[in-house]
Amino acid sequence: MNIQSILSNKIKQAMRQAGADEQCDALVKPSSKPQFGDYQANGIMATAKKLGLNPRDFAQKVLDLIDLKNIAEKMEIAGPGFINIFLDKNWLAENIQVTLQDKKLGVTVEEIQTIVVDYSSPNVAKEMHVGHLRSTIIGDAVVRTLEFLGHNVIRANHVGDWGTQFGMLIAYLEKMENEHASAMELADLEAFYRAAKEHYDNDETFAEKARNYVVKLQNGDAYCRTMWKKLVDITMQQNQRNYDRLNVTLTQNDVMGESLYNPMLPEIVADLKAQGLAVEDEGAQVVYLEEFKNKDGDPMGVIVQKKDGGFLYTTTDIAAAKYRYHTLKADRALVFSDTRQSQHMQQAWLITRKAGYVPDSFQLEHKNFGMMLGKDGKPFKTRSGGTVKLTDLLDEAIERADKLISEKSTALSSKEKAAVIEAVGIGSVKYADLSKNRTTDYVFDWDIMLSFEGNTAPYMQYAYTRIRSIFNKTDISEEQLHPAKIQLTDEKERLLAIKLLQFEETVQIVGKEGTPHILCAYLYELAGLFSSFYEHCPILNNDNENVKLSRLKLALLTEKTLKQGLDLLGIKTVEKM
């Protein structure tokens, strides 16, 4: 159920009847203040201007033609030509009944698309660090949302599993295996990588072997491929532990690394040359783009093949876009990566389109995100200035949550307490990120994210358990509630009902824009409205049985919506706190 869509369609129909063209837009949005109604149509003035009409006169004409019988209690013209819409409480009550009976809480399945979502993307033989956190959890929240909306989602973990460094890594893995030390050494991937690099820099015999292995690997040598696969598998097994701890849905089956596209790159460069898009410049193959200018104001050159024959990330991203359209048959491809990659992605996809590798209908979308900062406003680091390992961050989250929960909860069993600590610790790290607009930088602050006040995971998780506790105090089951009729006699009930019915329009924005913070804001507002309703509208101690059952149904739908919403974010809920 999408109130915004229902109202938009009805008002657009009236606008067209009043003389507007097919492209008119009612611009219906939830009202910012109660005195402006529940929803407001803001598109009247722009359309009136096009028609050369007085906006208020046109608004009146539209108002006379709108068919919102049984949907709106009243409508009024405000200011220069806004239309304020006050929803009918009986219509709201009926739709709450329907939504409560629906497993998807009123969210209708969209026209199904195949959507590739490229996210996380760590490097092989390196441990995941905090720099991988945003892509991993924002991407996963959007994946969960798109699947909930009914789409066929293909997860693409675009891992860095190819490049000249693999000769060095294979040579060092071989050395370790000869010394029977692989299991011990590879437990610390960072140390493994550093040791390999040190040998490469200081041992010419080792370096020569490494260079030979690069060539052999690129030529498909069976031994080198086996050793390479071993490195990939060990890395991804370690990464999987992070994904599992983060409650992220990625598995090793979702790996689509750079190596997947490597065989396609020579053909792509040859084709770009044949089309006249790529030209030789100082031995390299370069595509000059008029749409981008260098500092001298000339078309910017984008290298697709170096003079030594090596390929670049741009070439790989062109191949990935082509593969996702032709092989995976996708309608959309979303890439979650740092804002600093924005120009790179724009250029790769512009070349992809100029070459005719994908049609205009294929949506290529860079869902960029800002940086995670420390309290000093600089990139988040360890106290010594090093990169924070993801596993260390999650360990600290659990430690801090343990301290917090131990101080607050004494009535939990050890099993219940462990579940709460994990849910709060990991949930706090995720929610602190997901609740921020992904395009902005944000400050990582333990004290704020672990607070039980404000837009935080602990507050949201507690709001859920608070509603669960209501049902733990009554013998009335969900089945017994089923025949009860919803009554919205109090304004607090009506406002809560409207917010509950806005779940679909919220989820659809997240799926379209890739913005989980919109869902976080919705859930926070919902929890606040429920709190206000709970304080002002007695439930279990209400003498009127019909009112009591109606309010229990509102509480039940709030509980289900909070749980479903948090699940879409990958945040666990608990029954007791």
Curated annotation (Swiss-Prot):
The record ties this protein, via Pfam families, to:
Arg_tRNA_synt_N, DALR_1, tRNA-synt_1d
Gene3D superfamilies, per database record: Arginyl tRNA synthetase N-terminal domain, HUPs, Isoleucyl-tRNA Synthetase, Domain 1
CDD domains found in the cross-reference section: Anticodon_Ia_Arg, ArgRS_core
Main location group: cytoplasm
Motif 'HIGH' region: list the residue ranges: 122-132
Arranged from A to Z, the UniProt key words for this protein are: Aminoacyl-tRNA synthetase, ATP-binding, Cytoplasm, Ligase, Nucleotide-binding, Protein biosynthesis
Q: Which family does it belong to?
A: Belongs to the class-I aminoacyl-tRNA synthetase family.
Q: What is this protein called?
A: Arginine--tRNA ligase
* Protein's organism: Histophilus somni (strain 2336)
Q: What is the lineage of its organism?
A: Bacteria, Pseudomonadati, Pseudomonadota, Gammaproteobacteria, Pasteurellales
